[in-house]
Amino acid sequence: MFLGTYTPKLDDKGRLTLPAKFRDALAGGLMVTKSQDHSLAVYPRAEFEQLARRASKASKSNPDARAFLRNLAAGTDEQHPDAQGRITLSADHRRYASLSKDCVVIGAVDYLEIWDAQAWQDYQQTHEENFSAASDEALGDII
């Protein structure tokens, strides 16, 4: 399970050090993909394969489903952390998420999100006030 907030730095080569507590879960390979809110999502390979299989079952005649699948597949990069637990984020991913040197990695239960630190701060300021109301609306009786 991926939980918590971490603040690694992006180096000049586009490498980001993953939090040590997640490295074992990601050692077998991981998938970095574009996510909502101009962040990046990092999935263990097996978890991403399940997501991709579910997405590929959507009707190919539905233009929204085709667009989602195209964006998912085209915007995904397979990575294997190096001995120091670093992954290299592509220039396209760094641009998409507007990543600067200061990044935030957050646990999102079954995957990680990578944010630019300022973008994450802005997101939190905008959405934190609505957290209680949003959780009631979005999750209903689940929690």
Curated annotation (Swiss-Prot):
Localization per record: Cytoplasm, Nucleoid
Paired cysteines (S-S): none
GO annotation, cellular component aspect: cytoplasm; nucleoid
Coiled coil region boundaries: none
InterPro entries reported for this sequence: MraZ (IPR003444), MraZ_C (IPR035644), MraZ_dom (IPR020603), MraZ_N (IPR035642), MraZ_sf (IPR038619), SpoVT-AbrB_dom (IPR007159), SpoVT-AbrB_sf (IPR037914)
Alphabetized UniProt keyword annotations: Cytoplasm, DNA-binding, Repeat, Transcription, Transcription regulation
Domain SpoVT-AbrB: start-end pairs: 5-47, 76-119
Gene Ontology BP annotations: negative regulation of DNA-templated transcription initiation
PANTHER family, per the entry: TRANSCRIPTIONAL REGULATOR MRAZ
Homology family: Belongs to the MraZ family.
Subunit composition and interactions: Forms oligomers.
Protein's name in the database: Transcriptional regulator MraZ
Source organism per UniProt: Mycolicibacterium paratuberculosis (strain ATCC BAA-968 / K-10) (Mycobacterium paratuberculosis)
Gene (UniProt): mraZ
